[in-house]
Amino acid sequence: MAKTGMYVGLDIGTTSVKVVVAEYIDSQMNIIGVGNAKSEGINRGIIVDIDKTVQAIQRAVRQAEEKAGIQIKGVSVGLPANLLEVENCQGMIAVNGDSKEITDEDVRNVASAALVRSIPPERQIVSILPQDFTVDGFEGIKDPRGMIGVRLEMYGLLFTGPKTIVHNIRKCVENAGLVVNELVITPLALTETILSDGEKDFGTIVIDMGGGQTTTAVMHDKQLKFTSLDQEGGEFVTKDISIVLNTSFNNAEALKINYGDAYPERTSANEEFPVDVIGQSEPVKVDERYLSEVISARMEQIFNKAKEALDQIEALELPGGIVLTGGAASLPGVVDLAQEIFGVNVKLYVPNQMGLRNPVFTNVISIVDYSANLSEVYQLAKIAVTGETVVAHHTTVEQEVTSYDNDSYDAPEETVYDEPEQKKSDEDVTTKIKGFFSKIFD
């Protein structure tokens, strides 16, 4: 259960940096502040310029502070799935003390025992997630503290990632004047937050379509089993439009928003619109079908790469189907195209928070909600990884600033797509622009 207090989530994306301030009262989330700044210094989800990224974080934080009426000191920041690896881990210890009652120290010690392994020098342990404990052979225990036992075992998941990515994220947050309260693995937060209990249990695929990369995650038996990352996203669709139509990037983005559809069969070749072409004195007419074919070509490539990875582990056989989210997923026709390519049920997840009902905010909302609901057992295991004491997540200071109303929030840096009505097809699509787990569901 979420603690009562204030929690702040930070999502450092390719196209924008988003900050959400959420207040929890009796485990109910109330979003009281949002910041959304255009990203700089980030390419394909990777930080390439620390100073520019710091500035973008500071802009987003200032917006959130003004709207929430608080001073933000610490954040839970998302860690992307780039080269993320997940493996099972197990630790076992003898219970300390004459009474043999299991304490916080025993939980920390058994987590430390589970970390004993060889890690390549370029990688580091990011997080350990306890799944259950065994006390003297009694299995399935979620919190062993207060129980009596001689032998304590812990079974969990261990997440490792590249030192460079982890360091750069921490460096940017700290240089922005903030404390990293929690480093949250974004695909884990997504699958835990947006899926129902049944979807987590029976198995579901989540595809997060961002501006610079697309992340595929599989949850089964209530565990994150698999992640895959393709460094292509919605920004690449815009670049394709810009190149094919010989127009500026900004014009291409506007065309995608106003006329774009990822499913050509829904569009018409008779519907035309003007395009400002570089080198032409007058706008050139382009039909809706042609634009849709340019968009669908890139989207098909993204989905086919995801399908290839999912086919290797037979994940498409899971009954939960696919849940799409992220800004690029909200483009009209994406759900129809995905359903055609994957051959399973596909749906779009949209956050239900007032003023933030757009998939571009799914990640940051998931980050803050996931961190707010972390258990005490997790926090104890976390100390084994960081070697630090747990930092309070809701350290904020009240300021005399304008209060924030969710209903009036406007996100000028983000694209909001409205799904149009179904359109009739009049021709087929023509020429287009050219893990480590296996059999995990046995």
UniProtKB/Swiss-Prot annotation:
SMART domains: FtsA (SM00842). Residues 407-419 have a biased composition (Acidic residues). GO terms for biological process: FtsZ-dependent cytokinesis. It is found in: Cell membrane. It is a peripheral membrane protein. SUPFAM superfamilies: Actin-like ATPase domain. One of its GO terms (cellular component) is cell division site. Residues 401-428 are annotated as: Disordered. Its main location: membrane. Pfam families: FtsA, FtsA_C, SHS2_FTSA. Keywords: Cell cycle, Cell division, Cell membrane, Membrane. InterPro entries: ATPase_NBD, Cell_div_FtsA, FtsA/MreB, FtsA_C, SHS2_FtsA. Self-interacts. Interacts with FtsZ. Belongs to the FtsA/MreB family. Cell division protein that is involved in the assembly of the Z ring. May serve as a membrane anchor for the Z ring. This is Cell division protein FtsA. It comes from Enterococcus hirae.
